Swiss-Prot record:
GO biological process: trans-translation
GO molecular function: RNA binding
Known role: Required for rescue of stalled ribosomes mediated by trans-translation. Binds to transfer-messenger RNA (tmRNA), required for stable association of tmRNA with ribosomes. tmRNA and SmpB together mimic tRNA shape, replacing the anticodon stem-loop with SmpB. tmRNA is encoded by the ssrA gene; the 2 termini fold to resemble tRNA(Ala) and it encodes a 'tag peptide', a short internal open reading frame. During trans-translation Ala-aminoacylated tmRNA acts like a tRNA, entering the A-site of stalled ribosomes, displacing the stalled mRNA.
Upper classification of the organism: Bacteria, Bacillati, Cyanobacteriota, Cyanophyceae, Oscillatoriophycideae
Family to which the UniProt record says this protein belongs: Belongs to the SmpB family.
Main location: cytoplasm
Protein name (Swiss-Prot/TrEMBL): SsrA-binding protein
rRNA-binding as UniProt keyword: no
Length: 156
């Protein structure tokens, strides 16, 4: 189920894999244009951000490949398509800034987390650069070293 964090924020889904696979450069908060059954399914926490990414087409930001499970209590006729493209609600100046940065080689937009903020569904989008294999190994090594140090401190 979703967990609470901070004032008026309820985290629905967290994309931990994105933090491992990418160097996060900047983050942006964006609203998402959703259908009714999508919101109901999100309230149940049935969202997967792992394979998701964002694109900018015709000066509009789009969230692609994010899986929101169909709402169980709605019939098939009224339900939404699980992996449809969803429009991100950003200010024009933010979109212009992102267009310039995404055109640089190797930068992409990935969703980091989805949450409710005062009843509205929000997504944290990160401008990110892909990590190389040796960067990932270094991250794992640092995490293991930190864990070993914490264990040693706890014993004393």
């Amino acid at each position: 189920m979703a967990k609470k964090s901070g004032e008026g924020q309820k985290i629905i889904s967290d994309n931990r894999q994105a933090r491992f696979n990418y160097h996060i450069i900047e983050t942006y908060e964006a609203g998402v244009a959703l259908q009714g059954t999508e919101v109901k399914s999100i309230r149940e926490g049935k969202v997967n951000l792992r394979d998701g990414y964002a694109l900018i087409r015709n000066n509009e930001a789009w969230l692609l490949n994010v899986h929101i499970s169909p709402y169980q209590k709605a019939g098939d006729f009224f339900n939404h398509e699980p992996r449809r493209s969803r429009r991100l609600l950003l200010h024009k100046q933010e979109i212009r800034k992102l267009i310039g940065k995404v055109e640089q080689q190797g930068l992409t937009l990935v969703p980091l987390r989805m949450y409710f903020k005062r009843g509205w569904v929000k997504v944290d989008i990160a401008l990110a650069q892909g990590k190389k294999l040796y960067d990932k190994r270094e991250t794992i090594k640092r995490r293991d070293d930190k864990r070993a140090m914490q264990r040693a401190i706890k014993q004393y």
